[in-house]
């Protein structure tokens, strides 16, 4: 077996696999298997909880442990979530689906088999549209095929060096519901693979069927990678296992492409194997030779009846489906006049999109761009700085809309609005919808719009800054900005900037 690895430091040949779809004369072929935990409160075949982070082996029931005499009972919520996903990827739905046993031995698989769907999956062929290199000059759309998606139970987890250098087994995860999403081998680069994975990740969180927290293992990716000369038969594939970071996914695929090219260019043969990516050494290496499906001896599970889904159930789920990201993004551009960039940011998650639309519902569609600027720039910026999600925002959509309304009616200038926003973020106005009004009143942040009052301040500034006035009259435009700054300083930022500019120009001639 050739177990050669390739890193940036020790590669004999360097291959630029970042952008090209053909690398050193080879075509890259990638297929993805995604294991996504479904967010039910109990497991797929037992009543045990699915909470993350508890003491090892504290959330495994007798069903999960495979003790004699127990029988699995299918969780109906798992079926509903799988149907949502199938509808979301435009797939054929398996209204008749069955469960099978996948037989293999591993310490974290207590029954000696995994319950899965081999013969009749709940989701058949579908597709998802993605944008590769999104936001970059070389972005392009592509439709990625989905072969199938099936339900199965998760295995436990081996915990290495848990006790005195030994490996322990934590079965809390055993029996957690999974939907395994199998793509067509449609990806031709790491960029395309990453775009597909991100699109699936966004979809499952958008639909509310999974939290998809990669760091907790609830969204894991296996990448099947092969290379071939254009027009040749598919090459031998290797499987990069359990990748749980967007950054590592792209790097791992590129390193595996390099490794396979090196093997073939040296006259060797790629061996079908399961690969590990080592991020510290930035290399892939063989974990074990890859099993074929026959090695698992699949057969129907005798303890679980076939699942028959009525069409009215599908119709009910379809009717309750939310507007999907692509459609919502298009509507933001067409109906609200937002740029492609703004629409993409504001549909980054369903929660962000909902928040934004709630603000627009209060201020009106005509001011959607102003709402977008405040949500994207100020609010998301503050939340990102504090490592918070939009659901943790200390400013409600109605509170932000209330502040924007005061900008619209000239109660607030842009500068004063920043102060009000900061106070809202610190919850100084409380939980009431009119918190912005309370802050404006308590802090005296109302914009001065009385022409007479502003004119008096301007006249005083002109009198005290004769040199700057002469510079302006001598043709130095920067001096005018200096005078505006002096007026704003004298008014403590409360004077209406437009009125200040107008009055200054009138008095200076």
Swiss-Prot record:
Gene3D superfamilies xref list: 1.10.10.410, GatB domain, N-terminal subdomain (1.10.150.380)
Coiled-coil residue windows: none
InterPro entries documented for this protein: Asn/Gln-tRNA_amidoTrfase_suB/E, Asn/Gln-tRNA_Trfase_suB/E_cat, Asn/Gln_amidotransferase, Asn/Gln_tRNA_amidoTrase-B-like, GatB, GatB_C_1, GatB_Yqey_C_2, Gln-tRNA_amidoTrfase_suB_CS
Entry keyword set: ATP-binding, Ligase, Nucleotide-binding, Protein biosynthesis
Keyword Ligase set for record: yes
Catalysed conversion reaction: L-glutamyl-tRNA(Gln) + L-glutamine + ATP + H2O = L-glutaminyl-tRNA(Gln) + L-glutamate + ADP + phosphate + H(+); L-aspartyl-tRNA(Asn) + L-glutamine + ATP + H2O = L-asparaginyl-tRNA(Asn) + L-glutamate + ADP + phosphate + 2 H(+)
Any one of the GO BP annotations: translation
Record carries keyword Protein biosynthesis: yes
One Pfam entry name: GatB_Yqey
A single MF term (Gene Ontology): glutaminyl-tRNA synthase (glutamine-hydrolyzing) activity
Enzyme Commission number, as recorded: 6.3.5.-
Stated role: Allows the formation of correctly charged Asn-tRNA(Asn) or Gln-tRNA(Gln) through the transamidation of misacylated Asp-tRNA(Asn) or Glu-tRNA(Gln) in organisms which lack either or both of asparaginyl-tRNA or glutaminyl-tRNA synthetases. The reaction takes place in the presence of glutamine and ATP through an activated phospho-Asp-tRNA(Asn) or phospho-Glu-tRNA(Gln).
Family to which this protein belongs: Belongs to the GatB/GatE family. GatB subfamily.
Subunit structure as annotated in this protein's UniProt entry: Heterotrimer of A, B and C subunits.
Stated name of the protein: Aspartyl/glutamyl-tRNA(Asn/Gln) amidotransferase subunit B
Gene responsible for this protein: gatB
